[in-house]
Design a protein with these regions (language model features):
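Active-site-adjacent structural elements in enzyme catalytic cores
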Residues: 1-256
């Protein structure tokens, strides 16, 4: 997804990111690097697991949570002793990082709690004149956030699901990994991005129903709708009105 970037070594620039997003200051940012060779400058301890995952998935949608170096500002990490690090795989982002030469703190480029943008137009529509420059790299290929893996514990733990699956992580590490399933209270900060009780919330009404109730619910929803209506179903449905946007899983439901 598109990111809202700032010099990770400049506290004033980092504070501006929090201000523009409306993001709590105790909600840490991910630092983006141009290559895995820069890990030692940001992490106090780069474990063998970190090296394995970096070699396998960087550049790519994987963030490694490691103990932060003493030179990393608490403004970036939300006051926590850990830092999230990633090497993105988009050519424009990589060229920017190489030209800049340092780390760029970059959460998704949207107001805090809203859906992450996948085009430059989404960024402009949400953030407008609050950002100095919008670098248009075209539509995003993935469209979801990076997977975050905590490597500061004895057993690696996925803190946020994303572009790299648990199966692929376990295949590279050769062991099972944990999955964090409980959201932390919003008043207590978060160990990593995407871990608050409410996150990535679209500004839309959502109705859950059983398959046999779909027709009845659609009649009710369409009667009060003031905009587009989408339907996410486990299998294809027939006889839907033309103004319904229908989505269905690309694979077996168990995969989700």
């Amino acid at each position: 997804v598109y990111g809202l970037g700032a010099d990770a070594s400049n506290d004033a620039a980092v504070r501006r990111v929090f201000e523009v997003k409306g993001r709590p200051s105790d909600h840490p940012l991910i630092v983006h690097l141009s290559a895995a060779s820069h890990l030692d400058a940001w992490a106090a301890n780069v474990s063998s697991n970190a090296k394995l995952l970096a070699d396998a998935f960087w550049p790519g949608p994987l963030t490694l949570l490691l103990e932060r170096s003493s030179s990393v500002s608490p403004a970036v990490t939300g006051g926590r002793p850990t830092v999230g690090l990633r090497v993105p795989d988009h050519p424009v982002a990589l060229e920017l990082l190489r030209s800049f030469g340092g780390g760029i703190a970059g959460p998704s480029a949207n107001r805090f709690g809203r859906v992450s943008p996948t085009t430059a137009a989404h960024v402009i529509a949400d953030l407008g004149d609050d950002v100095d420059v919008v670098l248009d790299g075209g539509p995003c290929r993935v469209g979801v956030e990076s997977t975050i893996v905590d490597l500061t514990t004895d057993r690696p733990v996925v803190l946020r699901a994303g572009g790299v699956s648990v199966d692929r992580l376990e295949e590279v590490l050769g062991c099972s990994i944990g999955i964090f399933v409980s959201a932390e209270p919003s008043t207590g900060g978060a160990r990593a991005p995407g871990m608050l009780e409410a996150h990535y919330a679209p500004n839309a009404r959502v109705v859950l129903c059983a398959e046999h109730e779909i027709a009845e619910v659609l009649i009710e929803v369409l009667g009060s709708a003031t905009g587009p209506v989408g339907l996410l179903a486990g299998s294809a449905l027939v006889g839907l009105p033309e103004d319904i946007v229908e989505l269905e899983p690309a694979g077996p439901a168990d995969d989700y």
